[in-house]
């Protein structure tokens, strides 16, 4: 699953913003990628655990946002099922990361 997720993100990152601006799905994917990249742009603190938890939250949220675009615009049943699985898994992992950050200020 991780390999697929990273492949989706890498492919989406290769598309220049606005390149497919006429297509609603492309616009939604571009917006999701731009949000994720902006939210992930932060200077590391030197605390690997905190940096990992902090940076993974927007990364996972980006995956959720892209999966929601697939559910809204995609047709392939296998990809739609994968998108639903990604949303469920990533939401759980975000909750774990947020809980860790709260316990480790």
Kindly label every feature range from the protein language model.
Residues 2-10, 17-105:
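His/Met- and acidic-residue-enriched segments that coordinate or traffic transition-metal cofactors
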């Amino acid at each position: 699953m991780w390999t697929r997720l990273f492949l989706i993100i890498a492919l989406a990152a290769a598309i220049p913003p606005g390149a497919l601006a006429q297509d609603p799905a492309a616009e939604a994917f571009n917006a999701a990628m731009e949000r994720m990249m902006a939210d992930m742009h932060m200077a590391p603190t030197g605390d690997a655990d905190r940096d990992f938890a902090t940076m993974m939250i927007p990364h996972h949220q980006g995956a959720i946002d892209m999966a929601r675009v697939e559910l809204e615009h995609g047709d392939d049943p296998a990809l739609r099922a994968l998108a639903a699985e990604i949303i469920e898994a990533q939401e759980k992992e975000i909750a774990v990361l947020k809980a860790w950050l709260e316990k480790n200020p």
